[in-house]
Amino acid sequence: MSARRLTRRNLLLGSAALVPLLSRRADAFGEKSRFIPAVARHGGRWDLRLSGLRRIAWELQRRTSVEVVPDARPFALGSPELFEYPFLYFGGEGSFPALTEAEVANLRRYLTYGGFLLADANDGSDGDGFDSSFRREMARVLPQNPLAPVPSNHVVFKSFFLLDSAPGRLLNKPQLMGAMLGKRAAVLYSQNDLAGAWSRSESGDYEFDVSPGGEPQRELAVRMGINICMYALCLDYKDDAVHLPLILNKRR
């Protein structure tokens, strides 16, 4: 992996003077420079799409030059270990209890220091269930940075593949929602169950049907996942920094 792709991780570790640095374990296994999805543990059903995260990490390595560990590592939201991981997945089905004040403060610090959060409504909810709980907590974590629609010309739609929407297992909402810190999307939120489209069983079969678009929609969901991972890894992505030659090849 290039030094540029490590920018966000380095910022997190370099900025985390207020929390312990816990990188010895990662260094010992040669993992520090590899992409590993972290998963937010909360009081609800947070662990429904671990196979999807492992799969998107595998797809990221297969389709790009990013080195990965195809795993999904759960952490409490109050854990200082979050700061070792530039990408944090926060998914769930149904409502979940309020985060503690310590969890809210740690997640705010993580995002402020350069961490990235992908939220994913596994239940496809809108106004209730996971959606209601997540919006409630984001209003606590980033009260001055509300979720808003991400325009289709945002760099996340062209960070690797050229896309114009963000389908998942479902297509309830064609747009992503995002919370901006300056010019950076610190949070992206899908109500389409992105990881549900990625998930495979141990036998290798996809776990869930994709609706309404079937397998072409699943491929778009995988491409969107790769775009999001690439965006999460590159702190300084600009419109002119996208992989234009690869886009021109991959868009066909």
Residue ranges and their predicted role:
Residues 87-131:
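Short alpha-beta junction capping motif
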Residues 124-222, 226, 251:
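An acidic, glycine-rich "communication" segment
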Residues 1-18:
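N-terminal secretory signal peptides and thylakoid transit peptides that target proteins
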Residues 50-53, 57, 104, 108, ...:
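Extracytoplasmic/secreted envelope proteins and their assembly/folding machinery
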Residues 84-92, 159-166:
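Charged, often glycine-rich, active-site loop that binds/positions anionic groups
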Residues 40-42, 90-93, 120-123, 150-152, ...:
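Active-site-proximal beta-strand/loop segments in catalytic clefts of secreted hydrolases
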Residues 22-87, 94, 194-195, 202-204, ...:
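Aromatic-Pro/Gly-enriched surface loop or interdomain linker
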Residues 72-77, 100-106, 172-174:
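Alpha-helical scaffolding within the catalytic cores
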